[in-house]
Amino acid sequence: MVLHSNETFERVFLNEPVDLYIVQEAGSHVKVHVINLSDPSDKSDSSDISNTITIEQVGEGCTTELYGLAYLRGEERVTIETHVHHKVGGGTSNQLVKFVLDDHARGHFIGDLRIAPDAQHTEAHQTNRNLLLSDDAEMRTQPQLEIYADDVQATHGASTGQLDETALFYMQQRGISRQKARQLLVDAFMREVLKGAQNTDRSLCSLTEYGSIMS
């Protein structure tokens, strides 16, 4: 789809495969949340979902916000693939993608960020953070950055880890059960993306309660 000058596209995709291609003209704004949440009542789920979002900024002064979250259990597999191409200058983009993986779940993030030679004065950020709740869960992260302009602000980062045992211990010392402490830490990890999705689509008011039922 083509987003014409100064138009806005905001959308939350919840538990559905996504294949989205947007060309942004001058001054347009894109804000997309891709969220895949496991069914807490079905630990045998073996679904395999692929999400691909491609954004091309072809006009000056565009803004792009891409957020992704996957909370997976059982044998579930989810891929979130983003392509953000800055072809002209003066644009901004921010990508934040998080995975929470339990049981034998598999996550895969591919983040493609390109800044063309003519895209001076671009600001672009890409962040991928992942939380493993099981020794059998696996995460693959593939950041791909191609920056051909020199007058830009561009950052990227990726991290994969487990719950902080020190934080869990401290919370248990304060009378919080280990299971509840685990839930609270997972909630805090997911909340940034879930809250943003809720602000975009008010019908998703229950999303911020999701982590508390994933026990």
Functional labels for PLM-detected ranges:
Residues 1-169, 173-176, 192, 205-215:
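Conserved beta-strand/loop scaffold segments within soluble protein domains that form the structured core
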Residues 172, 178-180, 185-197:
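Active-site-proximal cofactor/substrate-binding loop regions of enzyme domains
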